[in-house]
Amino acid sequence: TNELEENKKIECMENVVLKEGFFAETFPVNKAESAKMKIKKLPVEVGEVSETFQCAFENSGIMKDGIIYTIKTVPSYHGKQITLGDVMETGQVEEQYFIPEEKLYYTNPSVTHSDETEQRLPKEDRQTWQYLKGAKKLLRTSATGHEYVFSEGAISMIDQDDKPARTMLTSEGGFSRTTHIVKDKMTGRVRLLTATEAERIQGFPTNHTKYCLVKGKTVEMPLRKRRFMMGNALVVNLVADMEKTLDNIFAEE
C-alpha cells in the first residue's frame, strides 16, 4: 500500500512538472529519453542542509512537503529561436568594445586547459581570456590551512552567434568567465557586447537604458551601469508569456 501511494505521489508530481504546472503550461516540455524522476528528502535543520546536503538536480522539478522531485526535460518548442547573431550590430562598433590581441591568448589558441598544481602561470598569462575561460587546476589553501586542488572546466571562449545567448549576469562586460565575447560581424575581430546588444538579448528596445534621471536631470547612463542593469533584468519575452498564464489562472478563480 505504501509503495502504491508513493508511486501515485511521484506520478502526480511528474504530471505537475510535465503538464499541469505553471511553467509546464507556459513553457511546454517533454520528458528526456530514459529520464526518471529523482526524489530527495530535504533535511529539517538548516545547518544540516548547508553542511551535508547534496542533490544531483536535473533541469526541471518541484518541491512539496520538504521532498524534492527532479527530472530531466527537453523543450517542446519548434518555432523560431532568437540567436545571439540576430541581436548583434552589423555596422561599425566603437573601438572601446574590442579586446586587444595580447589580452585574448597567452599560448596556442587550441589550448583549453592549464595545470598549475606545480607552478602558477605568470600574471600576464592569467590576465587573458584564454586562461580565464579555460579549464584549470591549481593549489589553494582553506581557512583552516588545508591545501587542496581547485579545478573548473573549460567553457566556450567566443560565444557562437548561431545559438541563443547565454544568461547575462551583473558582471557582464567585466573580466569574468561569464562575460560574453563575440566576433564582430563587420571586422571579424573579437569584442565585448555593446550596451544595445545586451538590451536586445533581454528583450528590451534598443537604447532602453541610454538615459537615466540623476537629481531630476536626464543624463546618459554610464556603460558599466547599463550592462549591470541588463544583467540584473528579467527577459521581457519570458515575463510576457508568464503573464498570459497568470491571467488565465486569475480569470478562472
Describe every region a protein language model picked out.
Residues F57-E253:
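C-terminal target-recognition/interaction regions appended to catalytic cores
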